Amino acid sequence: MGKTSGAKQATVVVAAMALGWLAIEIAFKPFLDKFRSSIDKSDPTKDPDDFDTAATATTSKEGL
């Protein structure tokens, strides 16, 4: 066997990576769909730190 060119090796590597990515997408499709839909439903303007601080303050006032 002779030496393979760098371009041919790169093509094989890229094709293998694409095939691997496709296999992962197919194998985990239900989980990825659920994850992506939950991201779409999330509110980017909501700050969880503000919510936690308000809930903690309310809880501490009720305890007194």
UniProtKB/Swiss-Prot annotation:
Stretches for region Disordered: 39-64
Key word Plastid present: yes
Intrachain disulfide bonds: none
Keywords: Chloroplast, Membrane, Plastid, Plastid outer membrane, Transmembrane, Transmembrane helix
InterPro entries: OEP7-like
Tissue: Confined to green tissues.
CC per GO annotation: chloroplast outer membrane
Transmembrane portions of the chain: 12-32
Residue ranges, compositional bias (Low complexity): 53-64
Effect of substituting residue 29 to G: Impaired targeting to the chloroplast outer membrane leading to plasma membrane localization
Topology, Cytoplasmic side: 33-64
Biased composition annotated in UniProt, kind: Basic and acidic residues: 39-48
Motif position, AKR2A-binding sequence (ABS) required for chloroplast outer envelope membrane targeting: 29-35
Record's bilayer topology term: Single-pass membrane protein
Chloroplast intermembrane compartment segments: 1-11
UniProt subcellular location: Plastid, Chloroplast outer membrane
Taxonomic superkingdom: Eukaryota
Keyword Transmembrane helix: yes
Comment, domains: The transmembrane plays critical roles in migration to the chloroplasts and/or subsequent insertion into the membrane.
Subunit record text: Interacts with AKR2A.
Protein name stated in the entry: Outer envelope membrane protein 7
Native species: Arabidopsis thaliana (Mouse-ear cress)
Gene field: OEP7
